[in-house]
A protein has these predicted regions:
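Hydrophobic alpha-helical segments of polytopic membrane proteins
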Residues: 2-42
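Structural signal for the C-terminal ends of transmembrane alpha-helices
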Residues: 13-22, 122-132, 193-201
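Hydrophobic, glycine- and aromatic-enriched re-entrant/interface helices and adjoining loop segments
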Residues: 25-116, 135-143
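Alpha-helical transmembrane segments of multipass membrane proteins
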Residues: 11, 35-36, 40, 153, ...
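Membrane-proximal intracellular helices of multi-pass ion channels
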Residues: 115, 126-128, 132-140, 145, ...
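Hydrophobic alpha-helical segments of membrane proteins
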Residues: 2, 6, 80, 114-119, ...
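Loop-to-helix entry and N-terminal half of a specific, functionally important transmembrane alpha helix
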Residues: 132-170, 176
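A juxtamembrane structural motif centered on a specific transmembrane helix
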Residues: 157-215
Length: 215
């Protein structure tokens, strides 16, 4: 399951960097991962087919789902067809309730609705970063950082696949895609975040001396 591996590696890399912010530590592992990824794509046939479907979805049989997703996004326009009025979800777009749910959001709610969904994710990620920065100890900060990275990377991959920015891979949209297992794990992660947030350090306003030093 390459998509899950990518998410896990991204979480690992971010946590390592936050725990020990030294670029030199990450250079070799990142280079090794890039080389391994290129080898996997070039040596395994079906992964090459996915790349071809990504670059030329209109001429590839494997690009059917991508094309239907783009049709859904394009037909939504600025404000969409209306909630529940999607045509593509009626058997035209595979996995419309799961990995491709963002395309249905674009079709029913338009560009405005899609931007609202993205804005909600950004607000959540910003709040998670705030909690991580004000955690009482390093362990809590790293836990929240891992949750933040998980949600951010999964959202970016899902929206990237739906809009054909990156090759098609099966990653659900956090909190929105159908799937009990994914939602259950996300709820557990948010429970960890709430536990850390209850023990956050109190906010202390900067003193006049600190403000003068910053200026």
């Amino acid at each position: 399951n390459l998509s899950t591996a990518v998410v896990c590696v991204a979480i690992m890399v971010v946590i390592i960097f936050v725990a020990c912010p030294d670029y030199k530590i990450l250079v070799m592992p990142v280079v090794a991962l890039v080389i391994a990824g290129v080898l996997l794509i070039t040596t395994v046939g079906y992964r090459g087919d996915r790349i071809d479907a990504w670059l030329h979805p209109e001429t590839s049989d494997s690009g059917y789902q991508t094309m239907q997703s783009l049709y859904a996004i394009g037909s939504g326009g600025l404000f969409g067809k209306g909630l529940g009025q999607s045509i593509q979800k009626l058997g035209f777009l595979p996995e419309s309730h799961n990995d491709m749910i963002f395309a249905i959001i674009c079709e029913e709610l338009g560009l405005f609705g899609a931007l609202c969904v993205i804005a909600l994710f950004v607000m959540l990620i910003v709040q998670l970063r705030y909690i991580a920065n004000h955690a009482r100890d390093r362990y809590g900060a790293l836990v929240v950082t891992g949750v933040m990275t998980h949600i951010a990377v999964q959202m970016i991959i899902n929206i990237g696949v739906v809009t054909n920015v990156i090759p098609n891979t099966g990653v659900p949209l956090p909190f929105i895609s159908y799937g009990g297992t994914s939602l259950a794990f996300l709820m557990v992660e948010m429970g960890f975040v709430l536990s850390v947030s209850r023990q956050m350090l109190p906010y202390e306003a900067p003193t006049k001396e600190e403000l003068q030093m910053q200026q």
